Amino acid sequence: PAFGVFLNNKIYDLTYQLGSGVSSLKEAIHFDVLPDNNEELEEYLAHVTPYTLADVSFLPVIPDPGKILCIGLNYEKHRVETKRPESEFPTIFTRFPDSQVAHRESVIKPSVSERVDFEGELAVIIGKGGKNISESEAMETIIGFSCYNDVSIRDYQRHTSQFTPGKNFSKTGGFGPFLTIFMIIFRPIYNK
C-alpha cells in the first residue's frame, strides 16, 4: 500500500518521498511528516512521477484506524424525524475498521437485511491524541477531513437502543476517496 497527493487530476505517490519507516498515511500522520503548506507540498511533488486515477486502486483513507467514533443524530431535523428526545450530550457509537470499504468498491447489502440507507457524513480525522483537551485547542488535533458513507442497516440498528449493531456489517462504511489536510485549507485563518 502507498499514499499520495491528488492534484490536477493526478496522484503523486508520497510514500517514498517521506523516507523509510513511513509506509502508510496513518504512519505519516503519527510521525507528523505530512506537508502542511503549499510550498512544502510543491517541493515534494517536484520529485515524483504522477499516476492517473485509472492507475491506482484505493483503500479506505485510513484502513486501520485506532478508533472510529461516530456522532449520531448530528443535525436537528434528523433528530426530530426519528422522534428522539433532545439531549445535553451527543449520541456516540462506534464503527469497526473491517466495516469500511474503499472508493470504487461496492457497499455490500447484508442478506439478512431488508432496510439499508445511505448516510453521507463528514469524517473528521484526528491526528494528535491527548486527554483533557480544551475546547480552544481541539481544532489543533484535526489532521483533515474526508467523505464517509455511514451506511445504516436500519432493521438491525433498531433491534436495540444502540446504533452499533446496524453500523458494523462488513463493507458498509464507504471512506474516501481523499483526505483533505486541515492546515492547508485553514492556515490563512489561523495566521491572522
In which residue ranges do the predicted regions lie?
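Glycine-enriched loop-and-adjacent helix/strand subsegments that border the catalytic/binding cleft
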Residues: 65-192
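N-terminal non-catalytic cap/leader segment that marks the start of a structured domain
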Residues: 1-90
